[in-house]
C-alpha cells in the first residue's frame, strides 16, 4: 500500500530482504546526486527508490524507510508488503517463474517480516542489553532479526505464532524437555567415554532426577523437545512403537532450557551439556533435522581430540576450543532403521558451565544491526572498551578487530593449512570469549560443519578414519571456507563497526588482510590463503534465489548451484 506518512525509520527485516537481493543482482544503481538513493527499476515507467543511510563495500547497507515508488505521475512512499510484491512480480516476469512458486515465496517473506516486527515490538528490553557485558544465555537470545542476507530470515514453517513464541529464541523463552520411557532395543547411538545406557542415565539424573524411578535395565529415559515429541506422535513408525508398548510418554519434566540462536540447540546454565535436537521445522533454507552422517562427524572430531595431533594444535592455540559432541542418540523403528527426526546430540560445554556469567557471546548477536536503530551490541562493547582503556573509539575498534583476528581467524586458517582440519565457522558457530569487552578466546560449536583436507589423512588414520566421508576437495574448500569465515562472519564485524563510523570498512578489512598475509607466511599449505588474498572473486551463497526457488539446502544434490561469484573485498585492501 501507499503510505500516508514519510517518517524515516529503521526497518531491519526489510533491510535483510533488500541486501540479500542487492548482493545477488546487478540491475540496481546508485543515484548520481544527493540525497543518496539506491534505485531498483521495475520497468520502463516505474522504479523503487531507497534512501541510503550507509553504503557498504560488503553489501551490509543501511536504509532509511519507507521506500518510494517513483512513476511518471510522482513519488509515493510504500510499505514492505507493496515493495516486496513489486520486486517479486518483476523477478517472476524476468525469470519466467511459476506463479505458485512466487506466491509461496511472498507469503513466507511476509510471515518472516511480521514475526520480526512482533518480536521487536515485544522485546522492549533489547536496548538495555547494550549497557553491559552479556553472558552466554543473554547473547543467544539477543538475535531478533536473523541472517542479514536472507529474504525471510525468521521463517519457521510449520510453527504457528504460539509455537514460535515458545520454541524460538526471539522472545527469550525457556521450557523443559519432554521425556519418554523407551525399550532399549529401540534406542541407537554412540558414546565415546560411557556406554549408551550410562550416558542417557547421567543426562536424566542431572536434568530430570524426578523421573529416575521410571528407569530399568530394559527401559531407558529418552528426551525430546516438546514440539518434536508431538511431531513424532504423528509419524506412522512412532505410532507403531507406542502401539507395541515400546515407548511411553512421561510428559514434560526437569530443568528449563532456553533455545539458542540456531533454534534447534538448547542451553541450560546448570547442565554440563548443551543439546542439539533434530527439529522438523524449515528455518530459512533447510529443514533442521540431523542425520547420522552429521552426528558421526561430531564423534570423529571427539576421537581426534584424544590424539597427539590435537594436543599439538591446542598447544599452539591454547585459547581456541571446540565444543565436543562426543555422543548421540536416536530412536529405531520396528525394522531397526535409525530415524533421523529423533536424533539428539549433547555437546560438552564444561567451559561455559564453570563460568556461566562469563562474557562468551555468539558473534551473530554482536553484529546484528540494532533492531530499533542505533548501535549494535558489538559497537556498544567497543565503546565500553574505549571508555575503560581511555582510548578513542577508532583505537578500540582496531584493538577489537586485531584481537578477533588473533583469536578466531588465525587458529582456523592455521588448522586448515597445517593440520587439514576445516571448521566452517559462520556467525552462529563462533563464540567469542571476551574479558572486559576484548576478545581473549574462541569456542567453535556445531561439528556437523567440520571437514578435512587430504593432508589430514595421516592424522585421520590414527583413529582409523582415513576414508572419512567429509574429506574436502580443493574446490569445496575454496567455495565454503572463505564464505563462512570471511564473508558471513568477519565482514559482519568490519561492517558493523564501519556503519557506526568507528572507522571505514576499508581500513578495518586492511587489518584483516594484514593478519591473513602474516598467517600465510607461517603455514605449510597455502592454497586457501593464496586464494583468499589473490583471487579476484570468491564464491558466496545466494540465499535470496535459493529461497525463491524453494531449495532445501540440506538435501540439494549439488550445493554449488546456489553459489555465485563475489568480488574479493580484500583485493582493494592490498598494502
Curated annotation (Swiss-Prot):
This protein's pathway: Siderophore biosynthesis; aerobactin biosynthesis
Enzyme class: ligase
InterPro entries recorded: Aerobactin_biosyn_IucA/IucC_N, IucA/IucC-like_C, LucA/IucC-like
Keyword set includes Membrane: no
Signal peptide range in chain numbering: none
Biological process annotations from GO: aerobactin biosynthetic process; siderophore biosynthetic process
EC number assigned by the record: 6.3.2.38
Gene knockout outcome: Cells lacking this gene are not able to produce aerobactin and accumulate N-acetyl-N-hydroxylysine.
Keyword Signal recorded: no
A Pfam family per the record: FhuF
Gene Ontology terms, MF aspect: aerobactin synthase activity; ATP binding; transferase activity
Catalysed transformations (reactions): N(6)-acetyl-N(6)-hydroxy-L-lysine + citrate + ATP = N(2)-citryl-N(6)-acetyl-N(6)-hydroxy-L-lysine + AMP + diphosphate + H(+)
Keywords, ordered alphabetically: ATP-binding, Ligase, Nucleotide-binding, Plasmid, Transferase
PANTHER family from the UniProt entry: L-2,3-DIAMINOPROPANOATE--CITRATE LIGASE (PTHR34384:SF5)
Function: Catalyzes the attachment of a first N-acetyl-N-hydroxylysine to a carboxylic group of citric acid to yield N-citryl-N-acetyl-N-hydroxylysine. Involved in the biosynthesis of the siderophore aerobactin which is a chelator that mediates the high-affinity iron transport systems induced under iron-stressed conditions.
Protein family: Belongs to the IucA/IucC family.
Protein's recorded name: N(2)-citryl-N(6)-acetyl-N(6)-hydroxylysine synthase
Native source organism of the sequence: Escherichia coli
Lineage, broadest ranks: Bacteria, Pseudomonadati, Pseudomonadota, Gammaproteobacteria, Enterobacterales
